[in-house]
Structures are given as C-alpha cells and as structure tokens.
Amino acid sequence: MRIGLIDVDGRHGKKKWGATVYPNVALGKIARWHTMQGDNVEWAQPTDLFDRHHYDIIYASKVFNFSHGIDFRQFSYDRLEKGGTGYDIHKRLPYEIDRLQPLYELFPWVPKNHAYGKLTEGCPNKCFWCVVPKKEGFIRPYMDIEEIAIEGRTHVVLMDNNILAAGDYAKEQLQKIIDLGLRIDFNQAMDARLVTPEYAELLGKV
C-alpha cells in the first residue's frame, strides 16, 4: 500500500532561524508500523491529494486547534484518518502502533543521537487552561526509558506533562537514566512544588 502523511501544523519541513522543530511523534509511529508491514510511506504532497488513487490511506495529524486546517471535503479519499488534539482530544492510536517508536528517517533534521517520547501520561492537576487531564486522565506510567532510547540514541527529549507526579515510577526511571548515562531534555519543565530532597539528588545526577 501507499501511505500519505500530512502534518497539518506544517512542521515536518520547517527548520529556520535556529528554531527547534519537533517531529510529529504520532505520524512517526504510524510510519514505522506501515513500514513494518511492507508499505510505502511518504509525506503527502498537496497536488497528489486530488488524485484519489494516489494513496491507499492518508493520515492527517493536527496538534493545535489554532493551526490552519485543510478542507478535506474537496478530496474524495475512501481512507482518511484524522487525529491529534487539534481534531479530537479523545482519539488515540491503536495499541500496537502506540507502543512503537517513531520512524526517525522521516525527519531528516532530527540528530542521529536524539529520541523523543514520554515516560508517563496524564496529570493530577486540573488547570483550567490545560487539555491534558481531559485527554490523558490521571498521571500513570506509559513507557520505559529503554523503549524510547532506541538505535543508539543517547539524547532523549522527554515530553512528559508532569513526570515528578509519578512518584516511585518517576524515581525508578530517573535512576535508569542515570545508570544508562543518557542526556535528557525535560522538555515540558517540572513542577517545582514536587521536588523533594530525593528527587533533587536524582536530578542532580542526570
């Protein structure tokens, strides 16, 4: 099958002025799964969308609801899958895809030693402006650091919403990070109110 991917937020081809552009992890996981099935995966070009036979399936991901969307009504694809917080906060990847890591070849600007992922999902807080509790629920374990740091990638960008709220699981993962000698970017920051002496000691070694 021929698979077309669309990053509605328009980030897959942009990197200028030294800005950090993060890969769309969900589309990366979808790409890896289809590649494992022997399918051909590529970024969909706008002109190709008018040919309904060009792709067997199109996946469109929209992270932000303020991103300018695409009017898919002008296209007549039988298999169009739309996902991401910008479309539906409750739609999730199938389990067998969600457990995979992104196909990093899809994002040529990502350094060969970088990996992206989350150790936890959810958050115990209910900030009125945040979609996370509605989308992911209460804080819980999600992945092990060794699942994320694949292919010799030693610089891991963790996009957890509130990792320190995960208690013993967070401490276990921090110790693993230390033991593995990984460099970590806690990309979504941390809740300073949760930093205990034990956490401080672990974080000081990361």
Q: Where are the language model's segments positioned?
A:
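A cross-family glycoside hydrolase active-site/sugar-binding cleft signature
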Residues: I6, A44, S61, G83-T85, ...
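Structural preference for beta-strand elements that scaffold enzyme active sites
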Residues: I57, R79, H114-Y116, H155-V157, ...
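Ankyrin repeat (ANK) tandem alpha-helical domains that serve as protein-protein interaction scaffolds
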Residues: Y95-E96, F107, H114, P124, ...
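Flexible, charged surface loops at secondary-structure boundaries
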Residues: L49-D56, Q74-Y77, V110-P111, I148-R153, ...
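Conserved SAM/AdoMet-binding glycine-rich loop
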Residues: A149-V206
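A short, structured N-terminal alpha-helical element that caps or precedes a catalytic domain
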Residues: M1-R79, D88
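Ser/Thr/Gly-rich flexible loops in soluble cytosolic domains mediating phosphotransfer, phosphorylation
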Residues: R79-F107
